[in-house]
């Protein structure tokens, strides 16, 4: 009787190969679903970051105008403004208006422009 109990216990330890293959297959299916969704989330994040940087630069242009009665000729003249690491901005301004354009290297083929003369001023394509 004792030998039979020991034999059963030694056979019941661990998982079978089939059980492990089923678990690996389930993990593979979940990964196949999750990875494309993750890439889409990243794209939306990069686009949101670009919009935020363009809006912040536009706010910086308005702050510059309050102090100098003209808009800043470049983004480097804006007080206390720095864009995100992946965002590249171009600013131009005169006494009558300004334009801020930007791209984000994480979201290729997506550009946002804030032109003070436009209504609405922010346009992204």
Model segments located where?
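Glycine/proline-rich, flexible active-site/cofactor-binding loop segments
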Residues: 15-17, 36, 105-108
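Periplasmic/extracellular, small/polar-rich flexible segments of pilin-like filament-forming proteins
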Residues: 55, 59-125
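Conserved catalytic core of two-component sensor histidine kinases
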Residues: 24, 51, 58
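Alpha-helical hydrophobic helix detector
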Residues: 18-37
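N-terminal/domain-start alpha-helical segments
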Residues: 15, 20, 71-72
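Regular, well-ordered alpha-helical segments
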Residues: 32, 40-43, 59, 63-66
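Aliphatic-rich helix starts adjacent to a transmembrane/signal segment
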Residues: 37-54
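N-terminal leader/signal peptides at the extreme start of proteins
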Residues: 1-15
């Amino acid at each position: 009787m004792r030998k039979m109990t020991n034999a059963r216990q030694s056979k019941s330890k661990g998982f079978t190969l089939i059980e492990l293959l089923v678990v690996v297959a389930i993990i593979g299916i979940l990964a196949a679903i999750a990875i494309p969704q993750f890439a889409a989330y990243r794209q939306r994040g990069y686009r949101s970051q670009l919009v935020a940087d363009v809006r912040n630069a536009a706010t910086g242009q308005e702050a510059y105008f309050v102090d100098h009665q003209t808009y800043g000729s470049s983004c480097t003249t804006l007080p206390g403004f720095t864009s995100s690491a992946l965002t590249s901005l171009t600013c131009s301004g005169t006494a009558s208006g300004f334009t801020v354009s930007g791209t984000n290297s994480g979201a290729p083929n997506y550009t946002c422009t804030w032109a003070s003369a436009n209504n609405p001023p922010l346009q992204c394509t």
